[in-house]
C-alpha cells in the first residue's frame, strides 16, 4: 500500500520556504518543488501510516478539474491497494461546478480506497450537493485552514507562513498557506480522521 495524494498548493507544500526568493511564486525550480512536496502534510501522514508516499500536489491556481485531469493522466500508475487522499481546492478555479468535479473524481476513483478533504474553502459552500455520495468526504463543511485557525486559538502558535495568524486584519481568507508546523498539524488532523476507517 502507498499513500497517493492529489491537491493544490496546500498539498504541494506552498508556504514552506524560508527564502524570500520563492515567496509569492507558485512555479519554483525542481529543487524547491521537491522540497515542498517532501515536507507537506502528506509526508507526515505517510510516516504515521508507515507506507511510501507519492505527493501529486500542484501550485499555480490548480483547481478541482485540474486534479481530476491529473488523476486521469496517472490512472495506470495507481495500484489497487493505494490509499488515495484528495484535498479539494477552491471550487471555482476552473469552468466547472463542484457537483460535476466531485462526481467525476469519485466516479474515476470508485474502485480505490479514497478519502476527500477540503484544503481551505468548503467545496459545497456556495452550491448544494446533488445526488452525491459523501461517505468518503471527511467533514465536507470544514477545511484544513479551519483546523489550523482553531488550533491557533488553543495554542497561540502560528501555523501559517510568515508567522502570521489566520484572520488578522489585512489577511484575506484563503490567502495564507501553512508553515512547517501547520503542515505537521494538518497531518495530525488527517491521520486522526483516517486511523479508524482505513
Identify what each model region corresponds to.
Residues 1-63, 76, 178, 185:
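Serine-esterase "nucleophile elbow" of acetyl-processing enzymes
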Residues 66:
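Glycine-rich anion/phosphate-binding loops
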Amino acid at each position: 500500500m502507498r499513500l497517493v495524494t492529489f491537491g493544490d498548493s496546500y498539498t504541494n507544500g506552498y508556504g514552506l520556504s524560508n527564502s524570500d526568493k520563492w515567496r509569492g511564486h507558485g512555479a519554483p525550480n525542481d529543487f524547491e518543488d521537491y522540497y515542498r512536496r517532501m515536507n507537506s502534510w502528506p509526508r507526515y501522514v505517510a510516516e504515521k501510516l508507515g507506507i511510501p508516499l507519492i505527493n501529486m500536489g500542484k501550485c499555480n491556481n490548480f483547481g478541482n478539474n485540474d486534479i481530476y485531469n491529473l488523476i486521469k493522466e496517472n490512472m495506470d500508475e495507481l495500484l489497487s491497494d493505494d490509499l488515495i487522499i484528495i484535498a479539494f481546492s477552491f471550487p471555482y478555479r476552473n469552468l466547472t461546478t463542484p457537483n460535476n468535479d466531485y462526481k467525476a473524481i469519485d466516479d474515476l476513483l470508485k474502485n480505490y480506497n479514497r478519502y476527500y478533504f477540503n484544503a481551505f474553502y468548503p467545496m459545497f459552500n456556495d452550491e448544494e450537493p446533488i445526488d452525491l455520495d459523501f461517505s468518503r468526504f471527511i467533514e465536507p463543511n470544514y477545511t484544513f485552514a479551519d483546523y489550523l485557525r482553531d488550533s491557533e486559538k488553543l495554542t497561540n502558535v502560528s501555523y501559517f507562513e510568515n508567522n502570521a495568524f489566520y484572520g488578522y486584519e489585512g489577511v484575506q481568507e484563503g490567502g495564507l498557506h501553512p508553515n512547517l508546523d501547520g503542515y505537521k498539524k494538518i497531518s495530525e488532523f488527517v491521520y486522526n480522521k483516517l486511523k479508524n476507517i482505513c
